[in-house]
């Protein structure tokens, strides 16, 4: 794959992480397409050895942590700014670490990209959470940059210890 393209995609992801960590969520929304799908399936531990990682994940319609489109993402973002949003008062402090960025397919208009993440969140005095996993994205070229058209977030954890999932990945 083209190293310049990979570098541009890395810069896009680093900008996204910066916006999320600085709580610039409205600006983050501008990085998404109007028809975005942003979802996190539930991971389970099958009794038999799975043939593929997808065998460990819920399928669409079977349950999920969230399955958002632009409308629901806007609602989630605006809720974080509300004074009565108990899940984010006081706001979370996050650090998004994005690694192992791999271009899987480039059809000229859309690019399939996989990346690994570690999202560290702290709240209050002692609340700490770590979310670790992989993201399967579809980026769409837009005005010399990219927009996120689809993101599947796959957590390594089958059981979440976090009190909520109010952060974005």
Model-derived features with residue positions:
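Short beta-strand edge/turn micro-motifs at domain boundaries
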Residues: 108-114, 132-164
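Beta-strand elements of well-folded, non-transmembrane domains
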Residues: 117-123, 141
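Short beta-strand segments enriched in hydrophobic/aromatic residues
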Residues: 32, 117-119, 152
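Hydrophobic pocket/interface hotspot
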Residues: 16, 28, 73, 113, ...
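A solvent-exposed, acidic/Ser-Thr-rich amphipathic alpha-helical stretch
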Residues: 34-114
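A contiguous catalytic/ligand-binding core that recognizes phosphate-bearing ligands
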Residues: 94-97, 104-107, 120, 130-131, ...
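Short, low-complexity N-terminal intrinsically disordered segments enriched in polar/charged residues
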Residues: 1-34, 46
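A short, polar/proline- and glycine-enriched secondary-structure boundary/capping micro-motif
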Residues: 49-50, 123-127, 157-165
């Amino acid at each position: 794959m083209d190293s310049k393209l990979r570098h541009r995609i890395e810069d896009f992801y680093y900008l996204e992480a910066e916006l999320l960590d600085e709580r610039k969520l409205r600006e983050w929304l501008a990085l998404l397409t109007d028809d975005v799908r942003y979802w996190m399936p539930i991971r389970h531990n099958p009794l038999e050895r799975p043939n593929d990682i997808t065998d460990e994940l819920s399928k669409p319609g079977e349950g999920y942590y969230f399955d958002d489109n632009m409308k629901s993402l806007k609602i989630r973002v605006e809720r974080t700014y509300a004074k009565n949003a108990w899940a984010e008062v006081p706001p979370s402090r996050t650090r998004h670490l994005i690694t192992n960025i791999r271009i899987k397919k480039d059809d000229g208009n859309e690019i399939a990209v996989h990346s690994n993440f570690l999202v560290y969140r702290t709240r209050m005095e002692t609340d700490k959470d770590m979310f670790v996993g992989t993201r399967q994205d579809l980026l769409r070229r837009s005005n010399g940059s990219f927009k996120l058209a689809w993101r599947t977030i796959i957590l390594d954890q089958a059981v979440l210890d976090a009190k909520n999932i109010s952060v974005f990945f």
